[in-house]
Amino acid sequence: MINEHFERIVKEKFGFDFSPTQQAAMKNFLAFLFDRHPESLFLLKGYAGTGKTSLVAAIVNTLLQFEQQVVLLAPTGRAAKVFSGYSHQPAFTIHKKIYRQKNAREGVGIFNLGFNGNANTLFFVDEASMISMGSQDSNFGTGSLLDDLIEFVYNGRNNRLVLIGDTAQLPPIGVDVSPALEADFLQ
């Protein structure tokens, strides 16, 4: 039905036949997409060169064709630029999207978690392995980028999160594995 139609359009936009792992990822994404649990999260992991970003770009452009709101994010400006280049859609750093500077009386250079005015939106975050739990000394939000990102996304009405990353990449400083790519941790 709609799942098959959606998948067919993604395949057309992708431009190649899916590998077995991409086919499995597509099947799992469709289950996530049509799951109406309000706080569900989709985790897409794969090594470099497996086609994660290309698959997500095809999914994003198909979602836009169906008039689904999407926001594309990445931890760094460079990663956001690459994500935007693949998807042909604007992408932003996580910090730019979720934080707002406090007013001058409260302190210059201090950033609070901003208001999320998005509703019914899928937030896609590429290079999620770079997202850290942070430190208390941070000038941004709670000091935990991952916690702040999750809080920001789910503070909006009917928003959900898709985290994309490579477990073979180095984790954030001070941890052995990237918490943003650990399903057990995210639950």
Predicted segment positions?
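Conserved ATP-binding/catalytic motifs of P-loop helicase motor domains
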Residues: 1-187
